[in-house]
Swiss-Prot record:
Binding sites annotated in the UniProt record for ATP: 27-34
Stated role: Essential for recycling GMP and indirectly, cGMP.
Keywords: ATP-binding, Cytoplasm, Kinase, Nucleotide-binding, Transferase
Keyword ATP-binding: yes
Protein name, per record: Guanylate kinase
Amino acid sequence: MMQVLSIQNCATTKENPLSGKLIILTGPSGVGKGTLMRSLLQRHPELYYSVSATTRPPRPGEVNGESYYFVSRSKFEELIAQGEFLESAEFAGNYYGTPREAVLNQVQSGKLVVLEIELAGARQIRTSFPEALSIFILPPSFEELENRIRGRGQDSEEAIARRLQRAKEEIQAADEFDIQIVNDDFEAALQAIEVALFG
């Protein structure tokens, strides 16, 4: 049975020792991270979900401050320069980042904090917080992943090709993470995440 570890000593400790828990949820674009995350939060309101900042435009139905903090590229670069992110990365031509202060405050207060982030950011967090629990979500097959990405109907053929190439590369990194979960059956994948978090 996997235990979620408390973060005691961070590799980059200018911060105080942390008493809460940090969970990283990552995987390639289109694998269902966001849908799994939303269901997890509905079933477990005690979890703290870290809302990321991004420079990409909102998708239909996304709400600023709930889905993401939508900011301009110049504002994002200013926040990077000020050290306001725990991690930041560029993906598909847009920046994404995890706000530092809110996450550290929640972890220090003893909360279970879940970060749903891209691979590059997940690697940064694992370096800074080696005791964080990391979960990599995999598609049942690459063909299914392609169907999901195309099914969104939001990207050009060129953007889809870029996402698919990046997804191939990211899937190769799955073994870097503590737990790998295949999102074939949604409910089973959700339950596997719950077991990892709560035992």
